[in-house]
Amino acid sequence: MVEEVVRRLDIPDGVDVQISGRSVRVKGPKGELSRELWYPDIEIKREDSKILIRSVARKKQHLAMVGTIAAHIKNMIRGVTDGFEYRMRVVYSHFPIQVKVADGKVAISNFLGERKPRFATIVGDVNVEVGKDEILIRGMDKEAVGQTMANIEQATRVRGFDVRIFQDGIYLVEKR
């Protein structure tokens, strides 16, 4: 007989979770997130104030996917209650890097003295605030916040120089 794998997640007060077919919708004080979560032989149900993620198959892939789906739902719940915030620091030695936000993009000017600005796209519904030497990235969707941070970091990647000497760029300092 095949054992089933079950993960239970508690739904905190003030959060509403709706599951219909493959889609999971989470509403909270900060807003609403919706996502398609599906894998064969895995079902997602809501029972009272808990979410059940159940797999009938006992294969490694199914065990892993039960944990993955549970982690996605936990991140959605955390996103609508607390949100995610990444703090980045602008580091330069000689040429002062200037950062501006406009039209869903982050414009990075004067990087290593370059005349042409570099651009990084802002993914999804993410808020980017630019300070003097600091950038704050806030949002409900962890993946969108992380991808925006990665886009900014990759836009200031040093190519063709020794990175031990040319340490200019925009780097992640803190995740909350």
Swiss-Prot record:
Cite a single GO MF annotation: rRNA binding
Give any single GO term for biological process: cytoplasmic translation
Q: Name one GO cellular component term.
A: cytosolic large ribosomal subunit
| Signal peptide bounds | none
Does the record's keyword annotation contain rRNA-binding?
Answer: yes
UniProt keywords (A-Z) are:
Ribonucleoprotein, Ribosomal protein, RNA-binding, rRNA-binding
Q: What does this protein do?
A: This protein binds to the 23S rRNA, and is important in its secondary structure. It is located near the subunit interface in the base of the L7/L12 stalk, and near the tRNA binding site of the peptidyltransferase center.
How is the subunit organization of this protein annotated in UniProt?
Answer: Part of the 50S ribosomal subunit.
Say which family it is in: Belongs to the universal ribosomal protein uL6 family.
What protein name is recorded for this chain? Large ribosomal subunit protein uL6
**Species assigned in the record:** Methanothrix thermoacetophila (strain DSM 6194 / JCM 14653 / NBRC 101360 / PT)
